[in-house]
Amino acid sequence: MSPAAGVPELPALDGKGLRLAIVASTWHETICDALLDGARKVAVGAGIDDPTVVRVLGAIEIPVVAQALARTHDAVVALGVVIRGETPHFDYVCDAVTQGLTRVSLDASTPVANGVLTTNTEHQALDRAGLPDSAEDKGAQAAAAALSTALTLRQLS
């Protein structure tokens, strides 16, 4: 996997003692499974061997499950994919998911990393999924962002 332009190296993280949850949708299974694999690898690399993983059907279901997980975890990673179609549904789903995850994070004071891909094509999603031929691994990036922010919040407490 060659890095995309402008993407920083993922930091080394010591997440031992952090409770991490990952909520991932199942639409576009190959992509979502790859995102989940990337997030799990970052968790294990940070010393979190068994993050809580919850699967939901689609992206629109992710925020409410993230909300429940934010009550009992130090960080939450949201993973899924929404691919533009021929109707405005794409815009509604993307807006609802983004606003929902942001609200959950702020209301719970818990980092909720948005690793929900919003792309025009399936090819664009595959290129960001962390597969062997992908340019990026947004699952890994989202997990690193969630854990890094949780560690920052812990230092600020």
Swiss-Prot record:
What does the entry list as the binding residues for (2S)-2-hydroxy-3-oxobutyl phosphate? E86, T87, R128
Q: Name one GO cellular component term.
A: riboflavin synthase complex
Associated pathway: Cofactor biosynthesis; riboflavin biosynthesis; riboflavin from 2-hydroxy-3-oxobutyl phosphate and 5-amino-6-(D-ribitylamino)uracil: step 1/2
- Active site (UniProt): H89
- Enzyme class, top EC level, equals transferase
User: Keywords in UniProt for this one?
Assistant: Riboflavin biosynthesis, Transferase
From the UniProt annotation, give the residues forming the signal peptide. none
Q: What SUPFAM superfamilies does the annotation carry?
A: Lumazine synthase (SSF52121)
User: Catalyzes what?
Assistant: (2S)-2-hydroxy-3-oxobutyl phosphate + 5-amino-6-(D-ribitylamino)uracil = 6,7-dimethyl-8-(1-D-ribityl)lumazine + phosphate + 2 H2O + H(+)
Q: What is its EC number?
A: 2.5.1.78
According to its UniProt entry, the protein's GO biological process terms are: riboflavin biosynthetic process
Which residues are noted in the entry as 5-amino-6-(D-ribitylamino)uracil-binding? W27, A59, I60, E61, V81, V82, I83, N114
HAMAP family assigned to the protein according to its UniProt record, in alphabetical order: Lumazine_synth
What function does this protein fulfil? Catalyzes the formation of 6,7-dimethyl-8-ribityllumazine by condensation of 5-amino-6-(D-ribitylamino)uracil with 3,4-dihydroxy-2-butanone 4-phosphate. This is the penultimate step in the biosynthesis of riboflavin.
What protein family does this chain belong to?
Belongs to the DMRL synthase family.
Subunit composition and interactions: Homopentamer.
Q: What is this protein called?
A: 6,7-dimethyl-8-ribityllumazine synthase
Give the organism the record lists.
Answer: Mycolicibacterium vanbaalenii (strain DSM 7251 / JCM 13017 / BCRC 16820 / KCTC 9966 / NRRL B-24157 / PYR-1) (Mycobacterium vanbaalenii)
Gene name as annotated: ribH
